[in-house]
């Protein structure tokens, strides 16, 4: 069994490995609240476009 066949062969149907950012594909720093599913870096970039307003 070659390395290419073994790498990422385990099914990721649940947990942190199964979710990724809708914009960048990153798996770290994911905001799932309200069904956003975007990374926090992408959220800072697209927050105004989505409709979030900064009050302070």
Curated annotation (Swiss-Prot):
Disulfide bonds, paired cysteine numbers: none
Organism: Schizosaccharomyces pombe (strain 972 / ATCC 24843)
Any Pfam family: Ribosomal_S14
Protein's job: Component of the ribosome, a large ribonucleoprotein complex responsible for the synthesis of proteins in the cell. The small ribosomal subunit (SSU) binds messenger RNAs (mRNAs) and translates the encoded message by selecting cognate aminoacyl-transfer RNA (tRNA) molecules. The large subunit (LSU) contains the ribosomal catalytic site termed the peptidyl transferase center (PTC), which catalyzes the formation of peptide bonds, thereby polymerizing the amino acids delivered by tRNAs into a polypeptide chain.
Keywords of this entry: Cytoplasm, Nucleus, Ribonucleoprotein, Ribosomal protein
Name of this chain's protein: Small ribosomal subunit protein uS14
GO molecular function, one term: structural constituent of ribosome
GO cellular component annotations of the record: cytosol; cytosolic small ribosomal subunit; nucleus
């Amino acid at each position: 069994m070659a390395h290419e066949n073994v790498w990422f062969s385990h099914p990721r149907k649940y947990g942190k490995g199964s979710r990724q950012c809708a914009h960048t594909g990153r798996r770290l720093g994911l905001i799932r609240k309200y069904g956003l599913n975007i990374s926090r870096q992408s959220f800072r970039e697209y927050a105004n476009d989505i409709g979030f307003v900064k009050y302070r």
